[in-house]
A protein has these predicted regions:
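Exposed, low-structure sequence patches enriched in small/polar residues
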Residues: 2, 73-75, 88-209
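Active-site cores of enzymes that catalyze phosphoryl transfer or operate on phosphate-rich substrates
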Residues: 2-67, 129, 152-154
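Weak global preference for isoleucine
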Residues: 17, 38, 47-48, 59-62, ...
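Short, low-complexity, polar/charged sequence segments that are solvent-exposed and flexible
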Residues: 20, 30-34, 68, 79-83, ...
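Extracellular loop and loop/strand-boundary signature of outer-membrane beta-barrel proteins
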Residues: 23, 29-35, 65-69, 102-104, ...
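Surface-exposed extracellular loop regions of Gram-negative outer-membrane beta-barrel proteins
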Residues: 43-102, 171-176
Length: 209
């Protein structure tokens, strides 16, 4: 169920129920089979609240919850996502943060993730500075995806764009970025990367990069 009211508040609600899943095991020597319960009855819930703000800004709250019958794994993840822009919409502060809580066989595993990104996104000269931190136990995978964990990253992006047309050029952009990653626990070096690029669009809208 989804909808948005006249004041710009959006609401989304999702619910699904999954039945039991079984696997059949067979002994190669005796040929005997055994039916094994691998997943119990599961209830999947999601709720999203999204509020439109002035200057094309917004703030959102998201919660996902998975409850499984018996001693199977339960999961709860709550998070916020926001994008705040000034009146001219050329500067921004955006980010997100979430907390996961996994419970399995009376063992609790809490984890967290947060991202903050500030920058300038219009004009000839644009930039942004981003910091991201993901704890070792952060786990949204019951109703989400996780590409990396136990990591913190700092990323700087800088670009200069020319929008004034010339005889052959429509617009062009030169960019530079630097990224520095460290593992959280233990605190050790993980990655360092530099990247440069150039994008060119001619008057016939042919692109080169």
């Amino acid at each position: 169920l989804t909808g948005r009211d006249k004041d710009g508040l959006g609401v989304g609600v999702f619910n699904a129920i999954e039945g039991r899943s079984y696997a059949t095991l067979q002994d190669n020597e005796t040929g005997e089979t055994e039916k094994l319960l691998i997943n119990s009855v599961s209830n999947f819930n999601m709720i999203v609240l999204d509020k439109n703000l002035k200057n094309n800004s917004y703030i959102s709250f998201i919660n996902t919850n998975v409850i499984r019958q018996g001693e199977f794994r339960d999961a709860n993840v709550s998070g916020i996502d926001f994008d705040i822009r000034n009146k001219k919409q050329n500067y921004f502060v955006k980010g997100n943060g979430s907390f996961s809580y996994i419970s399995e066989k009376e063992i609790a595993k809490p984890g967290y993730k947060y991202v903050i990104d500030v920058g300038k996104n219009s004009g000839n000269f644009t930039y942004d500075l981003l910091y991201q931190e993901i704890s070792k136990r952060y786990d949204p995978t019951d109703m989400g995806f996780l590409g990396i964990f136990n990591n913190r990253s700092t990323i700087l992006n800088i670009a200069y764009s020319t929008y004034v047309q010339s005889k052959y050029r429509n617009k062009s952009t030169s960019s530079f970025s630097v990224q520095y990653d460290r593992q959280l626990k233990p605190d050790v070096f993980a990655n360092f990367a530099l990247e440069t690029g150039h994008f060119y669009l001619d008057r016939n809208f042919n692109a080169a990069q």
